[in-house]
């Protein structure tokens, strides 16, 4: 009952947001003509970004091919999201969970400016026809702990992972990220840090998936 109640509130508060950013992540509009341009490359992975109309912020995207079966990659992405595998994490509280949804409260460290916190809903969806799994991370309001002392609440997070078949029975992993930091930080000051964080996230996840042991892969074949 607690899980159902919390997730219902999440659905209502997410849909009630007045100014939804015009993103292309996870949509058919995510094509070359959407305005993506290369921003930076690290360890062979290129981060693209595109300006989001009506905001001063960018949406980020990165794609990497991995020699890991998609089913194994999807399971490990879920474990990473559930476990909070991120360098900036100070505190995580899983408020509710089911096999395909998580409701999470996080506090994260942000250099120079005040630390941030947020509540996000993570949903896992499998498309059998295309053999792809989507993990969408969406900020929600009105549930979870209040803003912690010394923190600023991040008002908008839209991010996630797309796991689908790649070459030679491997995985094509796509990462999307968009956020607005809240507080008094201007878009001009935030953009570089957001891009750096997005690139670090995809590089870290790619390394994690490449380290899956033969035993891990065999159990998921």
Give the predicted meaning of each segment.
Residues 4-15:
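Bacterial N-terminal signal peptides
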Residues 19-221:
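Eukaryotic helix-grip
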């Amino acid at each position: 009952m607690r899980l159902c109640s919390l997730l219902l509130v999440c659905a209502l508060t997410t849909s009630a947001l007045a100014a939804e950013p015009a993103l292309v992540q996870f949509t058919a509009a995510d094509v070359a003509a959407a305005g993506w341009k290369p921003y930076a490359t690290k360890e062979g992975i290129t981060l693209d970004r595109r300006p989001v109309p009506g905001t001063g912020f960018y949406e980020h995207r990165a794609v990497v091919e991995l020699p890991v079966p998609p089913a194994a990659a999807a399971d490990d992405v879920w474990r990473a999201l559930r476990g909070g595998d991120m360098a900036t994490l100070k505190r995580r509280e899983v408020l509710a969970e089911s096999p395909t949804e998580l409701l999470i409260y996080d506090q994260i460290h942000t250099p120079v400016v005040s630390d941030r916190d947020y509540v996000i809903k993570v949903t896992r969806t499998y498309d059998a026809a295309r053999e792809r799994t989507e993990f969408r991370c969406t900020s929600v309001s009105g549930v979870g702990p209040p803003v912690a002392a010394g923190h600023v609440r991040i008002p908008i997070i839209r991010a996630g992972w797309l796991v689908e078949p790649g070459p030679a029975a491997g995985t094509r992993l796509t990462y999307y990220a968009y956020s607005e930091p809240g507080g008094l930080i201007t878009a001009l000051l935030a953009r570089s840090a957001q891009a750096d964080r997005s690139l670090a996230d995809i590089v870290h996840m790619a390394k994690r998936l490449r380290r899956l042991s033969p035993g891990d892969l065999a159990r998921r074949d």
